[in-house]
Amino acid sequence: LDIDSKMEEAIKCVIEAGQASTSLLQRRLKVGYARAGRMIDDMEQMGVVGPHQGSKPRDVLMTYNEWLERRNALENRAD
């Protein structure tokens, strides 16, 4: 998974908001629907947010510090 600066910003955004939705990312990051949707799906794969729940926002499963630990683990695994 590619964790670029926009993805990092998206993860911080959903953790601060306490919920994750494509519309939140579209508004805050000024990205299109498709990109926002892919970001949410990638966050689910990384364990940052929970599964799709119909029209409700997804649950956020970690704090920012937990995310930093997970990111370091993912980056070390990629090396």
Feature locations, PLM:
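C-terminal intrinsically disordered, low-complexity extensions immediately downstream
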Residues: L1-D79
